[in-house]
Amino acid sequence: MIPKDKAIEILDDAAKMGVKSIIFTGGGEPTVFPDHLEVFAHALDLGLECSLNSNGAILRNGWQDVLPDFTYVRFSVDAGDANQYAKDRRVSSSIYSTVLNNITKVCAEVERSKSDCVVGAGYVVTPDNYIHVYEGIARLKHTGVEYVRMAAMQSTEGFDAYPGNTWERSRAEVKRAKDKFDDDTFTVVDLTDNVMGAKPDYDFCGFQHFVTYIGADLNVYRCCYTAYADLGRINSLKLQTFAQWVKSESTRELLTNFSARSCDNCALNEKNKVIMYLTDPDPKHVNFV
């Protein structure tokens, strides 16, 4: 874990340098950190827009004073019933109801406080859990979330990671749920057609310049997909501040000399292409809408 004082230092530097937003996320679970509410509150006090990606298993005393002030909170559930949840997460089946109850509490508090915080859920569809997708979405809608984000499993095998006809059946279950449950207060966001599997055919990775991923090991990485891998590592904050890291010539060289072609697959290809277009001094068809 990042020590609390170091986390505060990073946030202070980020705010001073003009960073606009921060996502508290994994790998790992942010709310396991004992002082996470203090860190969250400090980020808010600095004027940073904050968001949280959480498994929803933990709500510590005082969360009501912090989470409603976040821009969004998204809970990763990825299961339609307690047995599937226990199997995939390797935890007691009772945790599933705890998670759903916690999500319900957060949604209720956001509504009570008339907060603008958007509370949603994330659901990764796999060859193992797709059977209960319909029931899972129904349960999540009942908690009061505004949306559930349905995503495909990110695998270097692409569509081949779904054996037989499980891919088609997965998509069908998501569509069935969307047709049934979409209304003015709830949306099934279907992103299941975005399966990782495209190797970049360009060199410039613009995403690494816009989003900085700081791991729990205090290493800085190019993105969440290359986190905790040598390919993604861009130096460390263990012996320097975040501000020093940003101004470091070594950091600049590692960013400049990196080729996106080094990645076998990239889930951020479309974002990189947009960044390349926006930063191109002479983009094609710029005068046409």
Regions found by a protein language model. Give the residues of each.
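Flexible loop residues that form catalytic
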Residues: 27, 56, 78, 153, ...
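Residue-level marker of regulatory loop/turn positions in helix-turn-helix DNA-binding domains and
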Residues: 32, 206, 255
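Acidic-and-aromatic substrate-binding clefts and catalytic sites of carbohydrate-active enzymes
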Residues: 30-34, 57-60, 126-131, 199, ...
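Conserved alpha-helical substructure of the radical SAM core
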Residues: 1-65, 69-71, 165-169, 177, ...
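Radical SAM enzyme [4Fe-4S]-AdoMet core and its adjacent flexible, acidic
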Residues: 2-5, 12, 16, 46-49, ...
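Flexible mid-to-C-terminal extensions adjoining Fe-S/redox cofactors in radical SAM and related proteins
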Residues: 199-202, 219-289
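Short, well-ordered turn and helix-capping elements at secondary-structure junctions
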Residues: 28, 192-195, 249-250
